[in-house]
């Protein structure tokens, strides 16, 4: 873990150390007894450098969205710390978080649930500005028009309601809202997963353009490696609340080390029929174990074809295997 | 009437397409106008006693005539005038009682649903307690202890009928508060109060409005039954409920239908009309259509 910290520490914008988010499971009518813990996020370490896009990949239920929300303190973390610049977010009260909320924003997956259906667009986009009393009523219209232009929407439509827009347009509204406070760090929680394929590329390009223009840093959460490959600089692969591998995008695709990463990569279709026919998929056996009853040792050991005795007994730590490459696997270490 | 293409604009269009709802609304409006302009419509004062001509006896139980459109009641008062003025009292009681129950129910439902945990537990147990109150018994005891007044009826109905609103609002809040736009508002640092008022309340207003109409109909029925039993609106103030009191006498019930049929019918009509409006609203607000 110490190794992760020392890499270009000066350039780090946000770092997560030993982050755990556990949800107690209770049962009973009168006296609610705790019968177990869902370890949604179970000890994460990573750092995100200024101006980069950090991809976080994993299948559904592995805790990627929980991680994103815990960083913004929308979900309280159980353990660990989150440093933004030099401030520990987990130790702050919601009141102390207020000024930092300008810097840290979020884009949501479902563009139908992330916009208040009773508010016209002008109110949706200006809401954060009003919450931070950053604009007066007279400036509102100009500022919203400016933001709408930035994300490629026609400001003429600012008095319309969300249901009058398409999915892609709604996602643009969500992006405009997250940019309203001049955010520096944006958690993109599967921002294109709910969109049509034809629209996905547009939104991805928009996100990249804005990043270049405004110097943003993204935590890009996705379950689709091909999307992450396009947008990310570095990628972390998550499995059952833990990171199993972190490395640069190129390295990950050329030299995946963790068996789980290899499995994920083999599932990515290739846009060339000749090569696609030759693609061999690694099929893992069984299902993802329930986060209520995680296997002992390495979380992937129950499905890994190369699992040895040690894998089932001891949990591998995230270790540096080469420059800029960390893997949590006994096989590699 | 509403901002173009807003949720309420669509709902309005759907509502006006529903014939039954529009008829219900028209009937309700008719009674509201009747209540508002009671002094202009009623030929007599509601509590004016009439005497048999040339004699010093009340002209009671007089059959309908051109002088008394719906005859007179057991004290020689004009039934039609009492019916018109009764609309005022009945509607005032119902609307004020519903206002009380809606405010209490909405506030408690919002707090309960939004904050959850111990607050939710306390409020929901309170709801259980209030639901198990024997309303009639409670009112009879209150009216024997205190001087009966119309305000006691209003507050009594209001304080026992907020529970369904509270449960409804709580359930709606639980649904809405997990949506992403609430998370987005929290990520911007919006205060709890603002989230509740600006993001949650506007999105649960539709079911509350349906609940208000249905609650009004139920309050009218409640007032009628309380007044019929003599613990509601007291004489000489006319209400549709206490006008039915005369029907407790077998003689009236059997031989003088003009005394009890009109208040009974208007009561039925108004309640039915309001229910139709409520149904229409519910369909209009259902955006799945």
Question: Which residue stretches match the model-derived regions?
Answer:
Chain B
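Gly/Trp-centered helix-boundary motif
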Residues: 1-102, 106, 110-111, 117-118, ...
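Transmembrane alpha-helix boundary and packing residues in multipass membrane permease domains
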Residues: 31, 110, 139-144, 153, ...
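Generic hydrophobic transmembrane alpha-helix motif, especially the helices
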Residues: 69, 73, 100-105, 110-175, ...
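Short hydrophobic alpha-helical segments within the ABC transporter permease transmembrane module
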Residues: 82-84, 126, 169, 173, ...
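Transmembrane alpha-helices
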Residues: 88-104, 193-225, 274
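Glycine-rich helix-loop "coupling/hinge" segments at transmembrane-helix boundaries
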Residues: 143-145, 157, 173, 222-266
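Transmembrane helix boundary and interhelical loop/hinge segments in multi-pass membrane proteins
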Residues: 172-181, 280-288
